[in-house]
Amino acid sequence: MALIQCGFYSDSLQKNTTVHLVLPSPAPDDLLCGRDTTALYADGRRWQSLYLLHGSYSGGSDWLRYTNVERYAQRYHLALVMPSAENSRYVDMYRGESYLSYISRELPAFMRTIFPLSDRREDTFIAGLSMGGYGAFLAALTAPETFSRAASLSGSLDIRGFLRGQQPHISKMPRNYLRALFQDPMNIPDEYDLPSLLAGRAAAGSVLPRLYLSCGTEDFNLPANDRFYEEASALGASVRYDKHPGGHDWDYWDTHIKDVLAWLRGEL
């Protein structure tokens, strides 16, 4: 796989930003095992892509630093796009940058222009962990014409409960964090509440992304994942939910990002 760090100006964010990108390319073991890699450079080849979102306190390089996702993706010839979004919850912030607009619309359009990524909905996916799990579902439901599948690992899926202090780590967030996100943190618009957003899309007859969520049985986000699965299922969404032993940590995410990749390819 080819590893690229791409810096560019984002109109949505109104600042320079950085994206880490992994593109399919020959690897040393291909040579050692005698595999034919000429098809990787076929004229007009456009890769399927997975946008991978980080969690709170983190950045776009975390997936590369703490997991083997680059190696896992090599098997599927899948491009990985890993943006940085600070502690934005991937929303268009009240006092801050418009990360939802950036992730759901500007970034895919930019990536497809600069790199050989497919512009087909069925070839474009998004996933994330913790805050990024929420961001992945939010982006996919905001722009279902772009993303055909979305996956969440240990997702912080209940934004209203989170902002009301119903999760233990909210007290650890920076001062004025909530005020930067929303004008009124106790009155979150439906466009940022996943069940409400999903219900609105379903009522409008919109095409919906297929959803996958996975959570550890010792994870503090487990109740929120249980509730979202029940709500999404009741709305008729195509949703799969897996629970495994584990907590809110990289051991869980490194293991179960492999499940996400298998699900994307219909192997799960």
Kindly give the residue locations of the regions a language model identified:
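Non-catalytic cap/lid and distal C-terminal segments of serine-dependent acyl enzymes
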Residues: 1-268
